[in-house]
């Protein structure tokens, strides 16, 4: 009898663990979808309001590797007026408080970062 109870308890624990895992996976997938949406909104804002010529997404959102509940959005831009950098960052952060957005000016990026951008980045 105790063997049957242990088996039922074990099955119950496994089912609960699987349910939690499924919820986490779904939650992460939904967060990733929201991050992509915000990245596209940020691209539109940067191009229309700040005259940015090109926007490339890099990092875990672009690669799909290592994206997690605290991942941010990494955008590289070409053609942003240096005097408007902080204003643009402020506007981007106001798009959605759930995400931090790192804005990298390609003109000031080190050469090794530019190689990564060209190899792994996604143009938006």
Model-based region annotation:
Residues 1-53, 63-69, 80-124:
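Catalytic core of pol beta-like nucleotidyltransferases
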Residues 57-60:
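Glycine-rich beta-strand-to-loop/alpha-helix junction loops that act as flexible
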Residues 76-78:
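Short hydrophobic/aromatic beta-strand micro-patches
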